[in-house]
Amino acid sequence: MTSLLQYIFSYIEKNNPEHAARLNASIDLNDSFFVSKAESFFTRYKSFIEKKGLTIDYGIDCYLKLCAQMVFERLEFMRSGKYASNSFAEVEKQIYLNPEMFEYHMHGLVFSQFLWPEQFTRFKFFSNHIGKELKSGGKYLEIGGGHALYILEAMNQSTENVSFQLVDISPSSMELAKGIMEGLKIDFQLKNIFDFASEEKFDFITMGEVIEHVEDPLALLIKVRELLTPGGTAYISTPANAPTIDHIYLFNNADEIRKLFIKAGFKIVNETVQYAENVSEEKALKYKVALMYAAFVKT
């Protein structure tokens, strides 16, 4: 019987052999952790997409379209040195209020969580530490859940009496998260995180790849700190030099991200830094190779 991963790789090889060769060179299909997590997650995604009258081929096509779009964005970034958009209003008009474009973008990102090594390294980092951070009877909040991979992993490692809440401003993103998480006890909130009262507190907050989508990431980080209980922990990630159609705030390196976290009042407890290409630090900085930064922080 063909596994979902085998099917996905076979489909990509048939439709984009060059990209398939790149994946085969960077992904270890003998890694039991990778295979088990990917198979489990893609099974949930497949169930969701089939209930919409589609097949997993649709999601893979979205992923390949996303990859092609990112090549164009990268070329423009290297030419201009900046992201294509610098305002939320502009991105909202072009992407978030354009259902067709936002749909393919979100579904493509589902597959990138496992097919891009820098993304999976970040997830593995989260998985290795989240179990130790979840307190019995605690409250977990995820901001910008999207594909729901992280809140699903947190639930898998938590005790039964941890409550889970997911907040997102996008109805499309919320629909995707709800579909993938069907049958699980989560409080879904379609609202802006800034609408949360400062008195509402959480023991753990996850905010993966959100601050690059706003014009003022410092204000968002301060809001996250405000919502944490004393001694609470947050997991926050963001990329540097990673041009995509909906990224607004450009970080040039990991140090800029660290400094902003500290400015927001956080203490960095643990971190991971992963480049998108297997090159030296010198070359990565020279050619502005995309970097993924993630950290567990405390107030």
PLM region descriptions:
Residues 5, 9-95:
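N-terminal auxiliary segments of SAM/dcSAM-dependent transferases
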Residues 92-119:
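Class I SAM-dependent transferase core
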Residues 104, 117-136:
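Conserved alpha-helix/loop element of class I SAM-dependent methyltransferases that forms part
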Residues 113-115, 150-151, 173, 243-246:
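Short catalytic/ligand-binding loop motif for oxyanion handling, primarily in non-cytosolic enzymes
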Residues 125-131, 138-239:
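Conserved SAM-binding loop
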Residues 180, 215-226, 233-296:
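S-adenosyl-L-methionine-dependent methyltransferase catalytic module, highlighting the catalytic core
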